[in-house]
């Protein structure tokens, strides 16, 4: 059976007795979704092992969804577990209070049994590790200002995390190319200016 243990329960005699009693646990106290946070109370050392784990009593929805989940899974073998959960949540909301009442009563009975069996039980949910958030969403597109390169306008966009790297490369290229381009673009203008001045002197 599941027990809340302390530091004195780790003797060989107690460990052997717990292993013999492990297969006699009632099938009432289990959660419908094994991957949820409705986990357990840990032992005295803060570690969770197979025998130290005490699950929360089922609520009314879990009591109702036990048989419903099996039924939906058998009728729709290709349906994913997440889709089944969404469907069950919708179906539960559509039930009337009278239809839900038997399951609330059963959940209350299970809660009382759990309280009598584990008087010192306290629910401690597991903390989920935070995932690093991206600076830009995957589908974002930032339209940048147009840049004047060799007298031609070229619009471009930055996407995702490559924006800074692309912009730095473009700025590096422009810093090297702009002086040469500026000089080459000014040469024809100076030539035309000198030619115009010579023609003007000849006419006068």
Curated annotation (Swiss-Prot):
GO terms for biological process: cell differentiation; male sex determination; sex differentiation. Its main location: nucleus. It is found in: Nucleus speckle; Cytoplasm; Nucleus. InterPro entries: HMG_box_dom (IPR009071), HMG_box_dom_sf (IPR036910), SRY (IPR017253), SRY-related_HMG-box_TF-like (IPR050140). It holds the Pfam family HMG_box. GO terms for cellular component: cytoplasm; nuclear speck; nucleus. SMART domains: HMG. Keywords: Acetylation, Activator, Calmodulin-binding, Cytoplasm, Differentiation, DNA-binding, Nucleus, Repressor, Sexual differentiation, Transcription, Transcription regulation. CDD domains: HMG-box_SoxA_SRY. It comes from the Eukaryota. Acetylation of Lys-130 contributes to its nuclear localization and enhances its interaction with KPNB1. Deacetylated by HDAC3. Residues 175-187, 194-204 have a biased composition (Polar residues). Residues 54-122 bind DNA. Residues 25-52, 169-204 are annotated as: Disordered. One of its GO terms (molecular function) is DNA-binding transcription activator activity, RNA polymerase II-specific. Transcriptional regulator that controls a genetic switch in male development. It is necessary and sufficient for initiating male sex determination by directing the development of supporting cell precursors (pre-Sertoli cells) as Sertoli rather than granulosa cells. Involved in different aspects of gene regulation including promoter activation or repression. Binds to the DNA consensus sequence 5'-[AT]AACAA[AT]-3'. SRY HMG box recognizes DNA by partial intercalation in the minor groove and promotes DNA bending. Also involved in pre-mRNA splicing. Interacts with CALM, EP300, HDAC3, KPNB1, ZNF208 isoform KRAB-O, PARP1, SLC9A3R2 and WT1. The interaction with EP300 modulates its DNA-binding activity. The interaction with KPNB1 is sensitive to dissociation by Ran in the GTP-bound form. Interaction with PARP1 impaired its DNA-binding activity. Belongs to the SRY family. PANTHER family: SEX-DETERMINING REGION Y PROTEIN, SOX TRANSCRIPTION FACTOR. This is Sex-determining region Y protein. It comes from Balaenoptera musculus (Blue whale). The gene is SRY.
